[in-house]
Swiss-Prot record:
Keywords, in A-Z order: Ribonucleoprotein, Ribosomal protein, RNA-binding, rRNA-binding
Organism: Rickettsia akari (strain Hartford)
Key word Manganese present: no
The protein's assembly and partners: Part of the 30S ribosomal subunit. Forms a tight complex with proteins S10 and S14.
One GO term describing the cellular component: cytosolic small ribosomal subunit
Stated name of the protein: Small ribosomal subunit protein uS3
Keyword check for Ribosomal protein: yes
């Protein structure tokens, strides 16, 4: 079971280690708010892809306000010069949600080598620059283990190296207890758009077992 399902979704819950990326309560308008959340994430991820966004947490404490927390490797790109970019983003979200109280919090990811989303995006960027997929994968694995990761698995699928037949190659180092619910495993995917076609990248990073001090929402 743990080998097949999403490692993040498998651990989402109030008593488990992972928290939801959208926090809201709605009886009748859930569908509308859910679509708004998807559009906001798409706007941030595509508009600031160079910032290497790790996570977008959207909270709606009331019907009149929205709080968006963005974790990124390069937060300065999102903020912009004198806050110009973040002001544009705020106005776009106000127009999209019809809310006047829009709050945006930006956090820098310091240990980016053990953040699955950033590692996957980094590998995808290297593949787009025609770096060897084996070199990109092995470099990511070494950097992750040096920064405190206890295990990492990287998978690349597609026409690797320009081959006519698509295939999947993966490397794993350290431990990867996917069946253990208390294991803190970060998982993410990315896509590399190459001249040969799309190459899919998947990353699993094991950071140790769950404790109360490590839990986040």
């Amino acid at each position: 079971m743990g080998q097949k399902v999403c490692a993040h979704g498998f651990r989402v819950g109030p008593t488990l280690i992972k928290g939801w990326d959208s926090v809201l309560y709605a009886e009748k308008h859930y569908k509308t708010l859910f679509i708004q959340d998807l559009k906001i994430r798409d706007l941030i991820n595509k508009g600031f892809n160079q910032a290497q966004v790790s996570r977008v947490l959207i909270e709606r404490p009331s019907n009149k306000s929205i709080i968006i927390s963005i974790n990124a490797k390069k937060p300065n790109i999102i903020i912009g010069r004198n806050g110009s970019e973040i002001d544009k983003l705020k106005k776009a979200i106000e127009k999209m949600t019809f809310l006047k109280e829009v709050y945006i919090n930006i956090h820098e990811v310091r240990k980016f080598n053990i953040d699955a989303a950033i590692v996957a995006q980094t590998i995808a960027l290297q593949l787009e620059k025609r770096v060897s997929f084996r070199k990109a994968m092995k470099t990511a694995i070494q950097a992750s283990l040096k920064q405190g990761g206890q295990g990492i698995r990287v998978s690349c699928s597609g026409r690797l190296g320009g081959a006519e037949i698509a295939r999947t190659e993966w490397y794993i180092e350290g431990r990867m207890p996917l069946h253990t619910l208390r294991a803190d495993i970060d998982y993410s995917t990315a896509e590399a758009i190459t001249t040969y076609g799309v190459i899919g990248v998947k990353v699993w990073i094991y950071k140790g077992e769950y404790t109360e001090n490590k839990r986040y929402n």
